[in-house]
Amino acid sequence: MAATKRMTRLLALLLALCCLFPAAAATREEEKALFAQRLSELRSPAEAGMESGEYSLRTGNSAYFPHVSPGVIPFDQQAETPAPAPEGTFASDNEGVVTVSENGLMTAIAPGVATVRWQSPEGEKAVVVTVGDDLISEIGKNYVYVLNREYFSVARERLPKYNQYAKWYYRKKKEVGWCAVFTIYCANAAGFDPIKEADLDLEAPYTDLFFREGQVGNQYDGFNKLGRFVGIPKPGYTVTYVDMKKAYLTTHVGSVVAVEDRGDGIYAVTTVEGNMSNTVKRYTYLYDSNKSNHEITTDTRKHLQENMAMLPEEEHTDPLSQYELHTDHWSVFGFGATW
């Protein structure tokens, strides 16, 4: 009788597992399909401009007319990539705001709005260009695009430590933490020319800036030396976390892809981060800039403040974002102003 009961319980357990595993597999397949859909819907800045007929440029920045743009070219491939040579003519209706060269390179001169037209062999195409001093830089837009592209491409698949990002950075097998390496890979892919902290020129007028440092602390040191380690997030900035339990200031680094100002110093921040549970993850959380830690040093770390919180549950609307915090003992240390 006892043996029969044990066999019955075992069969019931096996039946439950058979029901559970197909359901889990189906859920994972649905998630992968959603990742693939998001990837197919993702648009580079130029592609978005072609579709919408609108483009934004930060004052002083340049970008090719969307329809002739070569796309987002990694820095280490730019030398071998020819400049566009489109047929036809370009013109701006307000050169005090935007000028355009004969090959379609638009340059933002001053805040305002201008319409740039391309008279091509196939007919006229027009783009309304908005210029502003506070807009995200062109390379910042590219960086956000690349980060999202990598996130949707990896689709939360588990990666080895010696993955495509580590291979690109180290050029030889090296199994180490790769959160900083992931940011450098994406920065290069976006067109940044990452530099070593040791090569930093404190007198140089850097505009767009990224550090080729596989150690999180070295990235922080570089931004901090230039006064570009800040307490307010912007898309395209890096974000460095502090371990409150150990008071370790540079425990991990990710990158900001979206920011929503909620008022009173509170921001909803969305990030893409490598080397989280051996994959690439996206997080969305609330950050309180009134409790910024960016000016804390090793001598003053006893004053570190907790400044992260979960969004209200009713705002957990994107199945591809993680709304649960990384841990219960991390806080934002600060943000690296890459542009």
Indicate where each model-derived feature is located.
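...with weaker cross-activation on analogous glycine-rich loops/strands in unrelated enzymes
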Residues: 193-281
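Extracytoplasmic soluble-region selector
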Residues: 26-135, 269
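N-terminal capping segments
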Residues: 132-195, 336-338
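Short beta-strand-to-coil "C-cap" segments at the C-terminal boundary of structured domains/repeats
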Residues: 132, 257-258, 287, 334-339
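Gram-positive cell-envelope targeting signals
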Residues: 1-39
